[in-house]
Amino acid sequence: MTETPEVTLYTTKGCHLCEKARELVLTVNPNTIIHEVDIAEDDSLMEEYSSWIPVLQRGPLRELVWPFGLFEVRAMLTL
């Protein structure tokens, strides 16, 4: 049985690159569960990610910071 991958997508309203990141994830695996976190709702997340979004995170140690493409997303989802 194959595990359904889960990722966290750090985003904010109006972020067109965040939409592209979401599309990349779903292109690699349409069954991926994406937990979207709006960094504008948390001061510490704003401080950490405001210059870097979109950011994809899978588990505590795997993180992709934009720019990334299908190759990087595929590698993240299959590890």
Q: Over which residues does each language-model region extend?
A:
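Alpha-helix C-terminal capping segments
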Residues: 25-30, 56, 77
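Thiol-based oxidoreductase modules, predominantly thioredoxin-like and allied folds used
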Residues: 31-43
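N-terminal beta-loop-helix "entrance" segment that forms/cooperates
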Residues: 43-50
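Structural micro-motif
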Residues: 50-56
